[in-house]
Amino acid sequence: MAASWWDDVHWNLWRVADRADLVATAHTARRVAREAVAPQLVAGARSGCEWTAEKANILASLDANGLTSILSSTDHGIATALSLAAWELAWIDGGAATLCLSGSLAQMSILDFGTKEQKDRYLDNSDRRHAALCLTEPIPGAGSDATFLSGGFQTAEWVPGSEPMLEIRKRGRFISHMDFADFVVAAVQGYTDRVRGSCLVILEPGDAGEFNRGSRVRKIGHQLASTTNPIFDLRVPASRIVGDYRMIDGVVVPNYDHRRLLEPTFRRNRAILSIMTASKLLSVVQPLINPTGQTTGEPECWEQMVELWAAGEAAASLGFSAARLSDELDCRKDPARKLTSQSALLSSAAKLFSTSSATVMLRHAAAFEGCWPIDGSAGFIRDKLLDAQIEALYLGPEALQRRLVSAAMIDGEFLETFQTWTEDLERHGQRLSGMGIHNLTCAMRLWHWTLGQLRQQTDSRGTRLFCDARQGVTFPMADSLCRLLAARSFTLDVLELEKIRNREALPTFTSSLFFDLSAVASANASGSVARACAELLFGYGEHFPVSATTRNAFDHLRAKLKLSLCGSAAARNRIAQFLRAEHQC
């Protein structure tokens, strides 16, 4: 997959070069992707959605190489290791990456909250047990299909002095891994007066009752993954409740509700899924700079490829930054609230930026000539676009991610942290030019100032412009923040690369190349921020008037941002010339 310098640069960008275990995981996943996944794609494995022997062979290869047991084999956090495996597999096919991840998604809540007995039984991968996480879409009691989809539990049998038996009724939709799952972690809600609240409960095929793996789901992408609509009507002991339960006045009360159990799981996996999607962008660019890659024809617009490359690097940087922070959080026994909130925000922002960028950029790339993979498959970019659109729905659609980001970005602690980030970057910008740092900090200050103004603006009735009900205001500001966070993460990664370039003996051109890419990413982010801030601040002027003082302050900030764009177009041209020269090698 790599040009001679590509891996070294990116391992250092993402802070994994010094971790032999992480590099080994990435190389293992790459080997499986090339030797097990790619041949199946060439043979037409994406042509059908049913679970076949050929797809089972891919799963067996993932098992044999330890890629389905990463969760139980690392002591330094699991998000970065899973992210690297997903990156390499999604480079070839998103469905293969889903095969690797879905079991971990189900097991994470057991790892975080399970009893010792549950961990011993369900996290021991010596016999390669596979798991599935069965939620409604997305959680019990939520969504337009809540009545049809949500699951429930009640006491089925309760002999005094013995453990209660629970009756579980659950219907799932679009559930991965069900064709071969050895157990299922299902979200259910209590619906009688003998049980209280919601929980996650572990189900096994041998339990009394109906364990129906469900009908096959017809999908436009991720065909290598198993996906069905399962049905469960089972009796299980109450000890299967993840995290155990308490007896209060004769009522079964789970120790944790399903939202608490899934919170760290979703935090990690939003970062991981963002990296799966970002991988698709760079997999389109990389063949153009690999002299041995098989590309044909001349791309119609090199500048568009520059935009795609910069977006892919920024998406990957934000995703890996969120994964590292998630690992740091997991390794702390009592993490601060500030760190927890920041990790949740970055994970949601990473997923939103990756999915929203990938679908647009890959749609443009589909019109280019010359961007074919090493196997020459004509459906290469089309398949990646379809997979990216499906990934945009995992763990909640883009609207949900925007809602999470817009709610978190007005937190006082985060806004203080955001100001600190801006000041830190300004100090770097005084030392280094040509990276677009000044441009990025101007955009960050404009966004922060505009957010404050929007939150203060009211109409004649005292109604605030910035409120949950007015998503036409909150969502564009959330999108703008995600672009800024992605550009910031990429800038910090490039600064890290500059620190170690001499020590790692990286090619001299990589610094200037990634400086230019960082400048392009910052320019793109600042342009979208300036447009969104102007539209939101003045676009509601008829009902939310803006004072002359506010207009002057905004004009001053935007003028500084415009001047800071100096050199960004030249950086874009230099990258385009580099791509053209590499393509002609």
Spell out what each predicted region is.
Residues 170, 337, 341-426, 513-585:
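Alpha-helix capping/hinge segments and adjacent helical runs
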Residues 1-101, 121, 560, 564-585:
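Amphipathic, small/basic residue-rich leader segments at the start of a protein or domain
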Residues 118, 277-284, 288-334, 340-373, ...:
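Extended, hydrophobic alpha-helical segments in both membrane/secreted and soluble proteins
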Residues 163-215:
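A short core secondary-structure module
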Residues 56-128, 177-180, 312, 316-319, ...:
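Internal helix-loop-helix
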Residues 435-585:
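C-terminal amphipathic alpha-helical interaction region
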Residues 128-141:
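A short, Trp-centered hydrophobic/proline-enriched beta-strand micro-motif
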Residues 216-313, 389-485:
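Glycine-rich beta->alpha junctions and the first turn(s) of the following alpha-helix
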